[in-house]
Amino acid sequence: GLLRTLSAMGQAHTPGYETAPAGANAKEEHLDFFHCPIKIISLNKGRSAVAASAYLSATQMENTWDGTTHDYTRKRHVVYAEVMLPEHAPPEYADRNVLWNSVDWSETKRDAQLARTVELAFPAELTHEQNIALIRRFVQETFVDKGMCADVAFHDKGDGNPHVHIMLTMRALQEDGRWASKSR
């Protein structure tokens, strides 16, 4: 499923990545993804989408719901961060603070599910540029093209464990810019 798709995309479409010749070490013949937890950020666990995004992107954001400022700017291992949006998304959603505050405000149930996070480990053998190209293509084709907003943060502490956090809206955006029913 998901990991096989990523592996195939890495071989076929990552600039500078060449498939090893037949008989080469199996580790060189394909990309291995060792880790892929998927989690839900929900209000009943006392979490907010704004706080989670600030943490993952190592930024400072204000939650307009309760006035809390979340400052994670001292984190130094975020190599790349980007908000990826469907074409019809309101342009202001390119600002992660606006996007996730909109999500927090749109969910009114006390046990509301706010966002989904996907974490993927990447091969240390690829360069940051190759990993970012792979991440962007995967997120675009798998989520954004289906109307989801994605907040992407690529982390590398230099410990041989480069990985990406993909934070997704639970609802797709409709063509008119309004939130659709939840995607489960």
Please tell me what each predicted stretch does:
Residues 1-184:
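N-terminal nicking endonuclease/strand-transfer module with a His-rich metal-binding environment
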